[in-house]
């Protein structure tokens, strides 16, 4: 019994020792496992750090690659520009090496395709035409370029115009409207009927069977709005406005004035629809005398050319001529006959209502005091033209500026009336200071 108990105790001790040894072995294995786990975590962290470094390096390389691409594109563009410049310089060099061409004028086109050309050096040539030249552009009077050796026509040049004629083209479409003109309602209606309507609705005249006037004569005192009216018509008709003063056509050399008139109408045809406005037409259109001097005869030649040009276009063409003068009484009757300036529109000095409308137009952008009475100003400025009223408004504004004010008062206007109209009284002796 005792032996059995001792044996059991011995077995238990052995089992305990086995368990203890197993426990120690497992603890040793567990330590080894954690050690390996720590090693793996360390390697993982090192690998992750390496990956982050590689990612940063990759981003840096991608950025450098993008910069390289941009630089490459810029270099390609620079190379393209250089190639274009080199080609242009090469072309310029080739052109510089070519001998200059001679300018000539075509006088006649022959049946066999050749042309008779008068060169700028004087002699005439029967010349061949280069295949590169558009024969539709070849016509008598055309300017052409001639080869020095063969005298062949190698190019058709643009028609030559005097720089003074080109300077006459004021505006493709002036910015003046009928709202900018006061006191001329009847005159506006008349000029619209004879100028604007034929340009915008020519088919209406064809249906009715009447021809509109070719030219309109505006006459009246200076400063009454003749030029302004012509500009407004050009604007509303959407036409090119070509303005000149007739004294510009009075030239020193024989035939010079007539040539300017000819080129003026050529420009009008090119820019059609167009309105030619000739101011102070009495400078070339005065009544012709038998006992004229050489200077008078040159003026008469210019007038004759103007009459010929007006006879040379159809009333329904896209060209209208408006002339202005202060001296209708001295004009040559040939100018005023039907087919030329056959519509005469008088532009008088404005009446009181007209002056009031003009004052409203010129003061609409001004900063006026409450005491400004435009009706009174219209009443006291009898005999004033539209230009005088504009000068009065400008002078009143200048008086306010002179006193560092941003509001124009009635007193400013009265002083301006006194100054502007007083000066007119000195010149004409006609103005009466009605407000005193």
UniProtKB/Swiss-Prot annotation:
Gene3D superfamilies: 1.10.8.60, Nucleic acid-binding proteins (2.40.50.140), P-loop containing nucleotide triphosphate hydrolases (3.40.50.300). Residues 7-98 form a coiled coil. It is found in: Cytoplasm. Keywords: ATP-binding, Chaperone, Coiled coil, Cytoplasm, Nucleotide-binding, Proteasome. ATP binds at residues 223-228, 362. GO terms for molecular function: ATP binding; ATP hydrolysis activity. The keyword Cell inner membrane does not apply. The keyword Nucleotide-binding applies. SUPFAM superfamilies: P-loop containing nucleoside triphosphate hydrolases (SSF52540). GO terms for biological process: proteasomal protein catabolic process; protein unfolding. Residues 434-436 are annotated as: Docks into pockets in the proteasome alpha-ring to cause gate opening. It holds the Pfam family AAA. GO terms for cellular component: cytoplasm; proteasome-activating nucleotidase complex. Belongs to the AAA ATPase family. Homohexamer. The hexameric complex has a two-ring architecture resembling a top hat that caps the 20S proteasome core at one or both ends. Upon ATP-binding, the C-terminus of PAN interacts with the alpha-rings of the proteasome core by binding to the intersubunit pockets. ATPase which is responsible for recognizing, binding, unfolding and translocation of substrate proteins into the archaeal 20S proteasome core particle. Is essential for opening the gate of the 20S proteasome via an interaction with its C-terminus, thereby allowing substrate entry and access to the site of proteolysis. Thus, the C-termini of the proteasomal ATPase function like a 'key in a lock' to induce gate opening and therefore regulate proteolysis. Consists of three main regions, an N-terminal coiled-coil domain that may assist in substrate recognition, an interdomain involved in PAN hexamerization, and a C-terminal ATPase domain of the AAA type. This is Proteasome-activating nucleotidase. It comes from Methanopyrus kandleri (strain AV19 / DSM 6324 / JCM 9639 / NBRC 100938). The lineage of its organism: Archaea, Methanobacteriati, Methanobacteriota, Methanomada group, Methanopyri. The gene is pan.
